[in-house]
A protein has these predicted regions:
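Membrane-interfacial segments
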Residues: 35, 74-78, 108, 112, ...
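Transmembrane alpha-helices and membrane-interface helical segments
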Residues: 25-33, 65-73, 149-153, 193-213
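Membrane-water interface regions at transmembrane-helix termini and the short interhelical loops
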Residues: 4-8, 74-79, 153-154, 204-205
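Juxtamembrane/interfacial segments around transmembrane helices
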Residues: 47-53, 71-72, 93-98, 115, ...
Length: 233
């Protein structure tokens, strides 16, 4: 993780793009502990730290944590009570940080200029360049091998859903638009997916037995025709 180009680059240029990462990892670990002792205090504490350190990225971080939480619910075959506890934790985070976040959300809600300049049709058109995943000033900084592993994950029941979520997030500008607080659709917000992408790569490699078929091959090579900097693959 610490060797990713995006982490080095953002720490040098704009640390606010990655300064929430330690707390994001701690919040994810707190989710693991929740399914052991059923205490969600850690989720509230580290979630509040994310908001206080980088409120602009907190929405995206909470979406990532929600995805991971649902994955853990599926593993433990329990949904209703854990999801209710997560809702309580998120409400607790909002209440603890309200004095800081409510004025900010009010200002963002009034920023109609940025929203109106983004056309809905542009948000619905998929982008196959993978600039949010591969080496890019504002991407996750992975190599093309990670994309191959994500595609392979589609062909295993255990990893299919997470691969699908990652692929849709990387291809659909609307996801970036929502995670950026409805301001713009820049791909730098996808940096928050780094923990999930690393997890997915590990899950795929854990049981790496695949038969290459035509659909898999097409998905693997498709982005190569849209990447503007092929020497970075």
């Amino acid at each position: 993780f610490v060797l990713l180009s995006s982490i080095f680059f953002q720490f040098h240029k704009q640390v606010m793009f990655v300064n929430y990462m330690p707390f994001l990892f701690l919040m994810l670990r707190s989710i693991d502990h929740y399914f052991i002792d059923h205490h969600f205090t850690g989720i509230i504490i580290w979630g509040s730290c994310i908001v206080l350190h980088s409120y602009f990225y907190c929405i995206a971080c909470f979406i990532v944590c929600f995805i991971y939480f649902v994955m853990q619910c599926a593993n433990h075959k329990e949904y209703k009570k854990p999801l209710f506890h997560l809702l309580i934790a998120y409400v607790g985070i909002v209440l603890l940080t309200a004095i800081y976040t409510i004025p900010t959300l009010y200002v963002i809600a009034g920023g109609s200029k940025s929203v109106s300049s983004t056309h809905l049709l542009d948000l619905l058109m998929p982008t196959f360049s993978l600039k949010g995943l591969l080496y890019n000033n504002y991407g996750c900084g992975f190599t093309y091998l990670i994309w191959i592993l994500i595609v392979c994950g589609l062909y295993k029941k255990k990893t299919r859903l997470l691969s699908l979520i990652i692929i849709i997030s990387m291809f659909c500008p609307l996801i970036c638009f929502i995670m950026n607080g409805f301001l713009y659709a820049r791909s730098k917000i996808l940096i928050v997916f780094i923990p999930l992408i690393i997890l997915q790569a590990g899950l795929v490699l854990e049981d790496f037995t695949f038969r290459i078929n035509y659909s898999m091959l097409i998905l693997i090579i498709l982005p190569l025709f849209f990447i503007t900097q092929p020497y970075l693959v």
